[in-house]
């Protein structure tokens, strides 16, 4: 059971392939869900520094996965960015 209805829509597409839970897309969706929950938590608890550190770590993991996906398959990267409504990473 998924608590977040937004993520459940994307997870339904991913659940067609049960073996695909380790895919980059599934991991990015999971990290995005955690990021949104932590962000709403930190709006209430501004001085929760351990949660801030956890949020920064998850953001870094998601950023690395998105960089990997953009190098390997640009089309899937663009689709995922569009579905999750995430900004595209800056290029140097």
Swiss-Prot record:
What keywords tag this UniProt record? Chloroplast, Plastid, Ribonucleoprotein, Ribosomal protein
Coiled-coil zones: none
List the protein's name.
Answer: Small ribosomal subunit protein uS15c
The superkingdom of the source organism is Eukaryota
Q: What is the name of the gene encoding this protein?
A: rps15
**GO cellular component entries:** chloroplast; ribonucleoprotein complex; ribosome
- What's the family? Belongs to the universal ribosomal protein uS15 family.
Q: Summarize subunit and interaction data from the UniProt record for this chain.
A: Part of the 30S ribosomal subunit.
- Protein localization: Plastid, Chloroplast
Enumerate the HAMAP family for this protein.
Answer: Ribosomal_uS15_B
